[in-house]
């Protein structure tokens, strides 16, 4: 197969109401709620969290490695599909995908929606949860990799490597979407950590004590 090409493009617009925002369009008072996509936010964390918990505690319920392996892989697969196709697009306006053209060339596309109208609708709580879940779970699997490696548990090592591959693929794809396909990943990751740390520090210092959280979502018909 021919070598792959990479490009970073804006996320395509359409005239449909964003999934999960139909009630918000009918009732503008819902725009200020804490989570505008509560179900998407829940499942963004549920599948990957469940995979970690099953891996940690499967020995309490079954001695069968095959059973544990199947359940963990099922949850990892569900998580990979959900994060790649749903939560990234709805929670932060990012999407990455791949296609092969008629000449057999593989193209990797990293899309981002950076328009002011969209960014003004992004829920900051959901955005923070998205990135924390995307980053922290690979860290856990990295620790499990070390435990399995030094504990000489090679059959579990295979399972952990599958988990790392699936989690790292989404993390890599969304970092590329957020910072550009041509930017070095190490510098992009460093910039991301600095940006998030600065934002959290500013929020803590500037938010009045006991004040309600700011409302960042405004109803609009633009995706």
From Swiss-Prot:
The lineage of its organism: Eukaryota, Metazoa, Ecdysozoa, Arthropoda, Hexapoda. This is Uncharacterized Golgi apparatus membrane protein-like protein CG5021. InterPro entries: TVP23-like. Residues 1-30 are annotated as: Disordered. Residues 12-25 have a biased composition (Acidic residues). It comes from Drosophila melanogaster. It is found in: Membrane. The chain crosses the membrane at residues 35-55, 56-76, 129-149, 154-174. Pfam families: DUF846 (PF05832). Keywords: Membrane, Transmembrane, Transmembrane helix. It is a multi-pass membrane protein. GO terms for cellular component: Golgi membrane. The keyword Transcription does not apply.
């Amino acid at each position: 197969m021919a070598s792959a090409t990479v490009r970073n493009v804006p996320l395509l617009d359409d005239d449909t109401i964003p999934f999960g925002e139909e009630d918000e369009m009918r009732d503008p008072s819902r725009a200020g709620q804490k989570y505008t996509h509560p179900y998407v936010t829940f499942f963004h964390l549920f599948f990957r969290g469940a995979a970690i918990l099953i891996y940690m505690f499967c020995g309490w319920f079954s001695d069968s490695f095959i059973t544990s392996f199947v359940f963990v892989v099922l949850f990892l697969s569900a998580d990979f599909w959900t994060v790649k196709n749903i939560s990234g697009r709805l929670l932060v306006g990012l999407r990455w995908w791949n296609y092969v053209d008629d000449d057999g060339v593989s193209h990797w596309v990293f899309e981002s929606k950076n328009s002011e109208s969209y960014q003004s609708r992004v829920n900051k709580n959901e955005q923070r949860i998205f990135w924390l879940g995307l980053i922290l779970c690979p860290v856990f699997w990295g620790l499990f990799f070390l435990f399995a490696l030094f504990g000489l548990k090679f059959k579990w090592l295979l399972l952990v490597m599958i988990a790392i591959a699936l989690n790292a693929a989404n993390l890599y794809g969304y970092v590329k979407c957020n910072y550009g396909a041509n930017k070095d990943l190490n510098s992009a990751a460093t910039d991301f950590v600095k940006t998030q740390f600065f934002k959290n520090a500013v929020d803590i210092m500037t938010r009045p004590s006991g004040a309600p959280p700011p409302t960042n979502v405004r109803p609009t018909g633009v995706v």
